Swiss-Prot record:
Monomer. It comes from Cupriavidus pinatubonensis (strain JMP 134 / LMG 1197). Transmembrane segments: none annotated. This is S-adenosylmethionine:tRNA ribosyltransferase-isomerase. HAMAP family: QueA. GO terms for cellular component: cytoplasm.
């Protein structure tokens, strides 16, 4: 049985990318090629490419599925009425005026109390707790106040404060549905020029929405990974995407998820027969080695943290040993890791 320690690996801290490259598609791409079955049925070849070379690994019959969520400025600093400092990180927008949020304070705020945020620009009312989160009531439409006064919530391993450059580069060029507190980072490598080349090559694309929560950075704390409680995220699958998947299957093409968030949404909505059901809902799907994939054939993804649920996910897709070999190579070849880092192309084992 695989344990948490099986998903650890040494990573020099200087390989954690602290800023995005100026040219989105200039990042590197590690292609994990699966060799034809022979004496070693799980043999792979690791190929170093530029991300813009990905077009050479795609066919006109293929379908790229992107997550069009948009990162909101979800972080606030403020004060309680007592003067004590408070930090708020919005996790999910529940309705026009209400959000779920993490609240950090020296003392737990009482239900009904006010939190004065953004240098007292406005105050939110503390509502009931939901697990580790608080419901907060905004005095005006929450998304408007978030956009006007909030700060971009960069991942915890990025050490600088967010600036105007991050506000552009920590969004995909196709982001349109606000609600995420972390970017679907595999999509950061795509730009308009690469989309034009994909269109010219006949490679089709479609979109879903999954609002990435801060739980994506939540560490696994149990050595027995089956005991880990996965965070929940909201997703939506359109009838147009379901039709595109059906057409792709008819044409003999592959469904390629752009990012682990797209993969999790697709697998959550997939039926046992491999068809995709339109609709929306919450998913806490936890994909680990041994999972039987219903829909996704390949994945474009960044490099993930040691001992993370996302490292377990890519190991389930490509194979534990293949991922270990790929990550060893990536460290030796000085690939850039995590959200602002380089990418991989993986096919299902």
């Amino acid at each position: 049985m695989l344990t948490l320690s099986d998903f650890d690996f040494p990573l020099p801290p200087e390989l954690i990318a602290q800023s995005a490259l100026p040219d989105r598609s200039a990042s590197r791409l590690l292609v994990v090629e699966r060799l034809a079955p022979g004496e070693q049925p799980d043999a792979i070849r690791l190929v170093d490419r530029a991300f813009s070379d990905i077009i050479g690994y795609l066919k006109p019959e293929d379908l790229l599925v992107f997550n069009d969520t948009r990162v909101i400025k979800a972080r606030f600093f403020g004060q309680k009425p007592s003067g004590g400092k408070v930090e708020v990180l919005v996790e999910r927008v529940l309705d026009t005026h209400t959000v779920l949020a993490q609240v950090r304070a020296s003392k737990t705020p009482a239900e009904g109390s006010l939190l004065h945020l953004a240098e007292d620009a406005f105050a939110v009312t503390v509502g009931p707790r939901v697990d580790q989160f608080f419901t907060l009531r905004f005095p005006a439409p929450a998304l408007d106040l978030i956009e006007q006064y909030g700060r971009l919530p960069l991942p915890p391993y990025i050490t600088h404060d967010p600036d105007a450059y991050d506000e552009t580069r920590y969004q995909t060029v196709y982001a349109r549905n606000p609600g995420a507190v972390a970017a679907p980072t595999a999509g950061l490598h795509f730009d308009d020029a690469l989309f034009a080349r994909l269109d010219a090559a006949g490679v089709r694309r479609a979109f879903l929405t999954l609002h990435v929560g801060a739980g994506t950075f939540q560490p696994v704390r149990t050595e027995n990974i089956a005991e880990h409680k996965m965070h929940s995220e909201w997703y939506a699958i359109s009838p147009e995407l379901a039709d595109a998947v059906r057409e792709t299957r008819k044409r003999g093409g592959r469904v390629i998820a752009v990012g682990t968030t797209s993969l999790r949404a697709l697998e959550s909505a997939a039926k046992p027969d491999g068809t995709l059901e339109a609709g929306n809902g919450d998913t806490d799907i936890f994909i680990t080695p041994g999972y039987q994939f219903r829909l996704v054939d390949a994945l474009i993804t960044n490099f993930h943290l040691p001992k993370s649920t996302l490292l377990m996910l890519v190991s389930a897709l490509a194979g534990v040993e293949a991922i270990r070999a790929a990550y060893r190579h990536a460290v030796e070849a000085r690939y850039r890791f995590f959200s602002y880092g380089d990418a991989m192309l993986l096919t299902r084992q």
